[in-house]
Amino acid sequence: GFGWGDKCINRKTRSMMNLAMLGALGKMEEWSIHCKGAQRNGVTKDEIRAIIHVIGIYCGVPQALECFRAANKVFADADLSIKNKNKD
């Protein structure tokens, strides 16, 4: 199988990879969709936060802020929230 059917990488890891790539590319609509799926695949809020921090390092703070905004909307819709721990 190709893509999601490939058993070489588990679904959680693949979700994390997708979030990093989509965030780096600035594809926020797709990022939001995959953020929801990532939760179903076992990715935690802390792991999503860590992915966003890496996006900030390699792609810039403005792009990381876009990802935080998208994540906050996804989590708000699910009645959860995510915060940048560095700001607390």
Identify what each model region corresponds to:
Residues 1-12, 40, 64-88:
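Acidic, glycine/proline-rich low-complexity segments that act as flexible tails and inter-domain linkers
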Residues 14-22, 52:
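Short, structured motif recognition centered on aromatic/hydrophobic residues
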